[in-house]
């Protein structure tokens, strides 16, 4: 299986608790538009393998295309990019590479601000069997929030 052993994250980022159940990625310093935030590597796995992973681990699998996903290499090596939460008005966006996802700042980001991305483009793929895992109520607070996020 193709594998990228390490993920990168900007030294300007850290993982913090968002509430009693969730964590998110936050800026520890100001970030300029266009700065690379994270490069998330891992293992490329077929859909059938995703369904065999522990339920809590499946949420870290990114759909790539044609029934393949990028999964973290292990539970102990989950990069910060896998922890970005959804927002309908994100401040980060991803550039998909062969074996990695690169998140960049879509605008200037203030110190202390949570780094978010929009999950909806990833839901527009060709893999309808994975879609039930990607259904949730968005509470981002954006005035044009999509509400229920689903493929």
Residue ranges and their predicted role:
Residues 2-93:
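Catalytic cores of histone-lysine modification enzymes
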Residues 88-151:
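C-terminal SET catalytic tail plus cysteine-rich post-SET Zn-binding segment of SAM-dependent SET-domain
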């Amino acid at each position: 299986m193709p594998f990228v052993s390490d993920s990168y994250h900007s030294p300007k980022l850290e993982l913090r608790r968002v509430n009693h159940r969730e964590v998110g990625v936050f800026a520890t310093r100001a970030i300029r538009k266009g700065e690379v935030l994270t490069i998330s590597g891992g293992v490329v796995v077929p859909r059938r393998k995703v369904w065999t992973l522990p339920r809590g681990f499946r949420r870290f699998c990114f759909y790539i295309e044609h029934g393949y996903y990028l999964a973290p290499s292990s539970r102990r090596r989950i990069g910060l990019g896998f922890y970005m939460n959804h927002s309908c008005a994100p401040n980060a966006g991803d550039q998909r590479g062969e074996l990695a996802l690169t998140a960049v700042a879509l605008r200037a980001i203030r110190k202390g601000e949570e780094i978010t991305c929009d999950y909806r483009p990833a839901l527009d793929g060709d893999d309808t069997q994975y879609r039930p895992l990607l259904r949730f109520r968005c509470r981002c607070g954006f005035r044009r929030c999509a509400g229920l996020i689903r493929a």
